Amino acid sequence: MMKIDNILISHLHGDHVFGIFGLLSTLGMLGRTAPLHIYAPRDFSSILHFWQGHFGEGVAYEIVHHLLSAKAPEVICETRTVDVLAFPLNHGIDTFGFLFREKWPLDRAGNPMRLGRSAAYCSDTAPFPEESEWLKGVDLIYHEATYGEEMHDKAIARYHSTAARAATVAREAGAKQLVLGHFSSRYKDLTPLLEEARAIFPETVLAQESGRYVIPIPERL
């Protein structure tokens, strides 16, 4: 937990942001001193300041809010091994997806030794034209699938996706794997959602709590 340096928040609906404040408090109690960078939509700043003023006593480390405002995929964070890009989603409020691109060391000619792997996180979103294009060639996509296609109209009205729509994005993007998540609680059995997606994009699985999804290391160039 203490190794966390960067946190990404897609949007400010409660199911995507409330949990962070317990984490911030825990890091403070554990004696964190290193700055923590949080990438989030504009209004997170006022929420953070409220929390710091009322509940942040004893939190000695710096919390840096980086405003997300991308209109198309753009790099927001770089580490030695990964570039993180943000891009806008379609959810009725400021909402962002994230694209992770692996970086490999360069050879003597200045070229990457391997092709970097990639993964995309698409949280709450209704369909929009640019999504598949922005994710072209990605290895793995996590995509929300709140509803089945039988509830297509409700999905659109609430700025969400169906399992079929998520699978269509993966197919059009040329992805290798699709992980579905963010299911409506109305579904006690998720098998129909999985089957709906696999009819369009066979390499689909359902997200699991603490699940791990392997992206194979590519051959050397």
Whereabouts are the PLM-identified features?
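Metal-dependent phosphodiesterase/nuclease catalytic metal-binding core
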Residues: 69-181, 189-200, 216-221
